[in-house]
Regions:
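N-terminal secretory signal peptides that target proteins for export/translocation
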Residues: 1-7
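Bacterial N-terminal signal peptides
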Residues: 9-20
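Signal peptide processing junction and immediate N-terminal pro/mature segment
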Residues: 22-24
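Signature for the C-terminal beta-barrel architecture of outer-membrane proteins
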Residues: 26-59, 68-69, 74-75, 79, ...
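Short secondary-structure capping/turn segments at boundaries of alpha-helices and beta-strands
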Residues: 62-65, 101-102
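Short, compositionally biased strand/turn segments
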Residues: 97-99
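Well-ordered mid-protein domain cores that form the structural environment of catalytic cofactors
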Residues: 101-103, 110-127, 131, 135-152
C-alpha cells in the first residue's frame, strides 16, 4: 500500500511539473533542428590482401537526428538505416527504424533535470560508468531508461540513473538483458564552503556507485558448484584540484566479484586507479598520467566481449595520433584485465616572429608512454583458488 501511495504521489508530482513546464513554454518559441549523415560504399575484390566482395556488393549506413526545443523542454529521435551495414560495423545491424529517442525537462532555476528514453552520461573519468557514441567506429552503448539530475544547492550535484544499454539494431533499437542502476554525487568545495570561496586552490570531490542486474544460473567446475552473481556493484572516489597553472586529479574504482567471459569466469574482485598531474602557461604545457587496472571489465551481459555492452570505460594513457601512419605502426588498446601504464607529454610553442617560430609560431610536442602487464602469480592448475580467482597479484608493477 505504501508503494502505491508513493507511486501515485510521484505521478502527481510529475504531472504538476509537466503542467508547469507547458505553461512556462507558452512564452518561448519552439525550435526544430536536425542533421543527416549518409555513408555508402562500393566494394571491389582485392586479391593482394584477400579481400572478398560481400554478396550485397555495397554497404549503406544512414541516420537523421530530429530535435525539438522549447524553453526547458526538449525531445528528439534518431532514425537509422543499415542496408546492409558497411564493413567494419557490427554485421548484425540491419534494417531501418528508430534507434534513439528521448524527452527531457531541465529547469536550472529549480535545480532539476529529468530525462526519459535514451541518453549518454559519464561519471568522473568513466572508470565505473560511461555511456557514449563513436559512430565512425560503430560504438553506441546508450542507456535507455530514466535519469534524474538534482542540484539541491549551488556546488552540489546528484545523479540517479536506471536503465538498460543499447546492444543491437534490427529495424529498431534492441537493448541488452542487464539492468544498470547508478548514483553519482559531485561537490565543488569552493562553492559549498563560504570560507573557501576566494581560495586560489579549487577543489572538487566526487563519488559514484553503479550496479548491474542480470539473471544467472549455477554451473559445475570439477567438484565445485559455482553460482553466477546476479547483482554486481562497483564504486569510485575522485578528487580534482586546480591552482593557477597546475591541475591534479585522481580516481580510484573498485568492483566486487564479477565472473565474465573477459576474465574466464573467475570471482576475483576488480580495481582501477587513474591519476594525472599537469602544468601549463603561455607556450608551454606538461602532462603526466599514471594508470593501474586489475580485472575491471564491467558489462551488462557477462557473456559478451570486445565492444558489446561495456558499462565502464578505461582510457588509454597514450597519445591520440593525428596521422594514420603512427597509429598503424604503434597501435595500443587498454588491457582491461590488467595492466600498469604511464605517459608523459610536453607541448611547446616557439613564439611567432622568431627565427624558428615564423609568422604564426611553431608548435612542438613530445610524448612517451609505456604499458606493462601486472606482476602476478597464477594459482596451480585445477586448484580451488585457480578456479575461483585465477591468480594472485604481487604488486602493481611489471
Amino acid at each position: 500500500m505504501n508503494l502505491n501511495i508513493v507511486a501515485r504521489g510521484a505521478g502527481l508530482w510529475l504531472a504538476m511539473l509537466a503542467g508547469g513546464a507547458v505553461m512556462a513554454q507558452d512564452q518561448s518559441p519552439a525550435q526544430v533542428s536536425g542533421n543527416v549523415g549518409i555513408l555508402w560504399q562500393s566494394y571491389a575484390e582485392d586479391t593482394l590482401i584477400g579481400a572478398v566482395v560481400p554478396p550485397s556488393k555495397t554497404g549503406y549506413n544512414a541516420f537523421a537526428n530530429v530535435l525539438y526545443n522549447q524553453g526547458d523542454f526538449s525531445a528528439g529521435l534518431r532514425y537509422e538505416s543499415y542496408l546492409n551495414s558497411v564493413l567494419g560495423f557490427p554485421g548484425r545491424f540491419d534494417g531501418s527504424g528508430v534507434g534513439y529517442r528521448f524527452a527531457r525537462y531541465a529547469d536550472r532555476d529549480r535545480g532539476i533535470d529529468v530525462t526519459i528514453g535514451n541518453f549518454y552520461d559519464q561519471f568522473g573519468n568513466g572508470l565505473v560508468l560511461r555511456a557514449y557514441e563513436e559512430r565512425n567506429l560503430g560504438i553506441d552503448n546508450a542507456l535507455d531508461g530514466f535519469r534524474l539530475v538534482l542540484t539541491p544547492k549551488d556546488g552540489l550535484r546528484l545523479k540517479f540513473i536506471y536503465g538498460k544499454q543499447r546492444f543491437d539494431f534490427r529495424d529498431g533499437l534492441i537493448n541488452g538483458p542487464g539492468v544498470v542502476r547508478a548514483v553519482d554525487a559531485e561537490a565543488d568545495l569552493n562553492t559549498l564552503v563560504p570560507a573557501w570561496a576566494d581560495k586560489p586552490t579549487k577543489v572538487t570531490l566526487g563519488a559514484s556507485f553503479v550496479s548491474k542486474f542480470q539473471p544467472g544460473t549455477s554451473f559445475n567446475v570439477d567438484s565445485l558448484v559455482l553460482a553466477m552473481p546476479q547483482n554486481i556493484g562497483s564504486w569510485s572516489y575522485r578528487v580534482n584540484a586546480v591552482r593557477k597553472g597546475w591541475i591534479a586529479s585522481a580516481e580510484y574504482a573498485g568492483k566486487i566479484n564479477d565472473p565474465s567471459a573477459d576474465n574466464g569466469y573467475t570471482y576475483r574482485n576488480g580495481e582501477a586507479f587513474l591519476a594525472t598531474l599537469g602544468y601549463s602557461k603561455k607556450g608551454l604545457g606538461v602532462l603526466l598520467t599514471a594508470k593501474m587496472v586489475d580485472n575491471m571489465s564491467f558489462r551488462s551481459d557477462r557473456d559478451l566481449r570486445l565492444f558489446d555492452l561495456p558499462i565502464n570505460y578505461i582510457p588509454a594513457v597514450t597519445q591520440q595520433h593525428t596521422y594514420n601512419l603512427a597509429a598503424t605502426l604503434y597501435p595500443y588498446a587498454t588491457v582491461i584485465t590488467g595492466e600498469t601504464s604511464a605517459s608523459a607529454e610536453v607541448f611547446y610553442t616557439i613564439p611567432k616572429g622568431s627565427k624558428l617560430g615564423g609568422k604564426y609560431g611553431t608548435k612542438l610536442s613530445a610524448s612517451f608512454s609505456a604499458a606493462n602487464s601486472l606482476d602476478t602469480t597464477r594459482y596451480a592448475e585445477g586448484t580451488r583458488e585457480q578456479v575461483l580467482f585465477g591468480y594472485e597479484r604481487n604488486s602493481w608493477g611489471p
